[in-house]
């Protein structure tokens, strides 16, 4: 369950970790030969690293959703170390059509359009759900061989600096969007609220 609602923090954590252990743990116990676990790029995002990759240590997170993904990832890494054939993906913000409800990333786009799009030295990284589905199909058709601990893949999609994302959203909506320069530390602090 993807929820950043602090009122649902405990439920989000328990659903994500418990559900993952039930499904992935059972698949390993049953001897399934190819398993794909969808983690989140958020488990690798942390200060002190100029660049992250699949070997970056797991982040210490406070927010329930990210913490549930981190703890689930830690569990899956333990399964990989014991030889369970799990391939792990780390998608960035997932966006795309036919969203049955407004996902967190699509909700962010709606806020950028209706309220404000930030302008910092960073940007927004997202992956189209159709591209992510294609990557998962490929992994299911091509089981990991050798060291399962190497079977971890960042699926980043596209990175848009804030000014470029603003231009793209203005082109799609046909209107000028409000943008406000925000210092990076202030913007990150806002994300923790």
Where are the model-predicted features located?
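NAD(P)H-binding glycine-rich loop region in Rossmannoid oxidoreductase-like domains
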Residues: 1-15
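Conserved catalytic-site region of short-chain dehydrogenase/reductase
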Residues: 4, 40-50, 94-100
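Conserved Rossmann-fold NAD(P)-dependent oxidoreductase catalytic core, especially the SDR/UDP-sugar
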Residues: 9, 18-65, 87
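Active-site helix of classical SDR
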Residues: 68
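Substrate-positioning beta->alpha
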Residues: 71, 104, 120-141, 151
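Conserved beta-loop-beta element that borders a ligand/cofactor-binding pocket
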Residues: 74-97
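Mid/C-terminal beta-alpha module of Rossmann-like enzyme folds, strongest
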Residues: 135-193
């Amino acid at each position: 369950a993807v929820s950043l609602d602090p009122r649902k923090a405990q439920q989000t954590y328990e659903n994500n970790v418990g559900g993952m252990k039930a499904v992935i743990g059972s698949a390993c116990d049953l001897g399934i030969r190819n398993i794909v676990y969808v983690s989140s790029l958020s488990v690798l995002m942390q200060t002190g690293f100029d660049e992250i990759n699949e070997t970056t240590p797991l982040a210490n997170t406070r927010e329930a959703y990210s913490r549930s993904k981190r703890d689930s990832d830690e569990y899956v890494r333990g399964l990989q170390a014991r030889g369970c054939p799990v391939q792990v993906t780390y998608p960035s913000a997932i966006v795309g059509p036919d969203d049955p409800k407004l996902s967190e990333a699509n909700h962010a786009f709606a806020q950028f359009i209706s309220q404000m799009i930030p302008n910092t030295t960073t940007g927004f990284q997202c992956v189209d759900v159709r591209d992510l589905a294609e990557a998962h199909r490929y992994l299911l058709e091509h089981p990991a061989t050798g060291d399962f601990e190497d079977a971890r893949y960042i699926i980043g999609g596209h990175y848009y600096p804030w000014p470029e994302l603003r231009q793209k959203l203005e082109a799609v909506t046909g209107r000028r969007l409000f943008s406000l320069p925000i210092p990076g530390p202030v913007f990150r602090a806002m994300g923790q609220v």
